[in-house]
Swiss-Prot record:
It comes from Prochlorococcus marinus (strain MIT 9301). The keyword Hydrolase applies. It comes from the Bacteria. Its EC number is 3.1.2.28. CDD domains: 4HBT. The keyword Zinc-finger does not apply. This is 1,4-dihydroxy-2-naphthoyl-CoA hydrolase. Signal peptide: none annotated.
């Protein structure tokens, strides 16, 4: 498997994604950004339940709350648009990581989402190190070289 398999995804804009002006409602960009990194880690081989806790079975002792997010729009995104979504994760420090999502339409960047997550112990809510499997995904994604290839 090559990095582009989990770093480049597709998103089709649907009617329900848009507002009355016929362009995507702003909050959907952040939703799509989060969904894209979820899909990316699954394609990479990390089961979703290993990252996102199911409190009924308590499989995970780690949570990743969003501590900062941002959405930037460069051009309208409309119903029916087919977007390429490029994922660019990177580690900020031992407990913080950022996932950037670049939304490309016809070769042009039309939007960008940035989400920063903090790695916390589920019970104490203390900061803890990013787990190994997630760290491996970030390292394997190697944004500085692989994003150019994508």
């Amino acid at each position: 498997m090559k990095p582009s398999d989990w770093l480049i995804l597709q998103k089709k804009v649907r009617f329900g994604d848009c507002d009355s002006a016929g362009v995507i409602h702003f909050h959907n960009l952040l939703k799509w950004s989060h969904e894209a990194w979820e899909e990316s880690i699954e394609i990479y081989g990390i089961p979703c339940n290993d990252i996102f806790p199911d409190f009924s079975i308590r499989k995970s002792q780690i949570i990743f709350p969003i501590v900062n997010c941002e959405a930037n729009f460069n051009a309208p995104i409309k119903i029916g648009d087919l977007l390429k979504v490029k994922i660019a994760p990177h580690k900020i420090n031992t407990h913080l990581f950022q996932v950037n999502s670049f939304f490309i339409k016809n070769g042009n960047k039309v939007a960008e989402g940035k989400i920063i997550h903090c790695s916390l112990d589920v019970d104490s809510r203390n900061k803890i190190e990013i787990p190994d499997q997630l760290e491996r995904w970030i390292e394997a994604s190697n944004v500085s070289t692989n994003l150019k290839e994508c």
